[in-house]
Amino acid sequence: MSIRIIPQDELGSSEKRTADMIPPLLFPRLKNVYNRRAERLRELAESNPLGDYLRFAALIAHAQEVVLYDHPLEMDLTARIKEANEQGKPPLDIHVLPRDKHWQKLLHSLIAELKPEMSGPALAVIENLEKASDQELEQMASALFDSDFSYVSSDKAPFIWAALSLYWAQMASLIPGKARAEYGEARQYCPVCGSMPVSSVVQIGTTQGLRYLHCNLCETEWHVVRVKCSNCEQSRDLHYWSLENEQAAVKTESCGDCGTYLKILYQEKDPKVEAVADDLASLVLDARMEQEGFARSSINPFLFPGEGE
């Protein structure tokens, strides 16, 4: 199954009814994303061996919240949605969509917001980014989108990604139209921008019991049925792992067919779970999965592979 975004003027009444049954796509609600993430990171840091890094990530998330309101984005995406729909491509495809200077403005604002909070190596990193030319920043952005992690050091990547993510999330929140589920390509990548998921969440509320993958870039969530590998769509060799017990709020789903795994967070076990924060706070589970021979099928926006990883 694949998901396409249909312009509002092309949605017939039957399509509107279908879209209302199980929403294939949940566009980002930016009013709550970054504050909630920062709060969750700080909460998890209190009893986590990686507490210092979680608090560092919380500073970035809080800065994203501040910059979001300091630099709102106005953009008409109607024509872009129609063009992408005709081409069968994600409307905000990271490999196709031209980037304007807005994302670099966001980056410099993030740096200005974070500078008073940073010291030591972290301060040196953002000062280095502050001096980078526009061309150098664009090259780093392209390298991250191409998964060329040898070009962007793992200490610079979270800051670059934080600005890119904020830019793409702003655009995603402005998309007009609805999404429709169709038969076709697999759903391992975000239908809005084509980036990877960070984790998946089994939700409560109006989407009770449904699993949504959470994009690590534009913050969109897309529906993927449970008990099916989100990477290869097989279901015959799936296993679930946790560090606590069967009632754990954070588990991994491993697939013997493709050899990958993805975290699954259960809101009914803990309503506070957050796609990025709880994934980052459970790296011990990642280490266990690597010991078992599985490769991660996602990337956390605060933890990028270093060169050679």
Swiss-Prot record:
<keyword id="KW-0963">Cytoplasm</keyword>
<comment type="function">
    <text>Necessary for formate dehydrogenase activity.</text>
</comment>
<dbReference type="InterPro" id="IPR056796">
    <property type="entry name" value="FdhE_C"/>
</dbReference>
<dbReference type="Pfam" id="PF04216">
    <property type="entry name" value="FdhE_N"/>
</dbReference>
<dbReference type="Pfam" id="PF24860">
    <property type="entry name" value="FdhE_C"/>
</dbReference>
<protein>
    <recommendedName>
        <fullName>Protein FdhE</fullName>
    </recommendedName>
</protein>
<dbReference type="InterPro" id="IPR056774">
    <property type="entry name" value="FdhE_N"/>
</dbReference>
<dbReference type="GO" id="GO:0005829">
    <property type="term" value="C:cytosol"/>
</dbReference>
<dbReference type="InterPro" id="IPR024064">
    <property type="entry name" value="FdhE-like_sf"/>
</dbReference>
<dbReference type="GO" id="GO:0008199">
    <property type="term" value="F:ferric iron binding"/>
</dbReference>
<dbReference type="InterPro" id="IPR006452">
    <property type="entry name" value="Formate_DH_accessory"/>
</dbReference>
<comment type="similarity">
    <text>Belongs to the FdhE family.</text>
</comment>
<dbReference type="Pfam" id="PF24859">
    <property type="entry name" value="FdhE_central"/>
</dbReference>
<dbReference type="GO" id="GO:0051604">
    <property type="term" value="P:protein maturation"/>
</dbReference>
<dbReference type="InterPro" id="IPR056797">
    <property type="entry name" value="FdhE_central"/>
</dbReference>
